[in-house]
A protein has these predicted regions:
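His/acidic metal-ligating clusters that form di-metal
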Residues: 95, 101-102, 118-187
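Short amphipathic alpha-helical segments
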Residues: 9, 42-43, 164-165
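A short acidic, helix-capping loop that chelates divalent metal ions and anchors anionic groups
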Residues: 4-5, 38-41, 161
């Protein structure tokens, strides 16, 4: 989250945060949090339409093929790698020192699964499918490029709660998307 859950979701706030990210001398990888869009319907956030704020985030913070920052990193975006998921520019991946990194758009505030708005529920299910496809494609890409590890980054605190119970420390765990099971080994 680049803003608190009780501050306004204005274009001005988005512009200020983008300018902040662009001041970093290194590359900046940004994945949206719930405060930036799903919580924007709240009165103290400005009573915005969350889906409109999501569209504004995608337009302002993402450029195909590169990260933010003064020395942007070359990235792959799901929107350009997987035409079926052309709307998901925020899902990014890159290889660094034999480690495959990928961002997933999974946020708090119930991940925008809102029963009071059909459009929000439809957005959730479409984005969830995109995230699953991106995880699977990332592991395929990691295998093809002989990556030694995969790191998945997202902002929601506990989206894989069942995994937390099956993998107790000190262990290293891998998620195999095709079977949706975790494989854990002692660290």
């Amino acid at each position: 989250d680049f803003k608190s859950g009780s501050t306004v979701c204005s274009d001005e706030e988005f512009a200020n945060q983008q300018a902040h990210f662009q001041r970093f001398k290194a590359a900046v990888i940004y994945t949206p949090g719930d405060n930036e869009w799903t919580d924007c319907h709240r009165a103290n956030n400005g009573s915005y339409d969350p889906l409109e704020r999501l569209a504004a985030l995608r337009q302002r913070f993402y450029t195909p093929g590169r990260s933010l920052g003064q020395n942007p990193l070359a990235v792959q975006n799901q929107s350009s790698q997987m035409p079926l998921y052309a709307g998901y520019i925020e899902n990014q991946r890159w290889l660094h020192q034999e480690v495959m990194f990928a961002t997933l758009h999974i946020v708090g505030s119930n991940n925008n699964l809102e029963s009071r708005h059909l459009a929000a529920a439809a957005e959730f299910f479409a984005r969830d499918a995109a995230n699953v496809a991106w995880i699977e494609a990332t592991f395929e890409q990691a295998r093809a490029r002989n990556a030694k590890a995969v790191v998945l980054a997202y902002t929601r605190r506990w989206p894989l709660m069942p995994l937390a119970y099956s993998c107790r420390s000190p262990r290293r765990c891998s998620i195999w998307p095709s079977t949706k099971r975790a494989r854990c080994t002692k660290a």
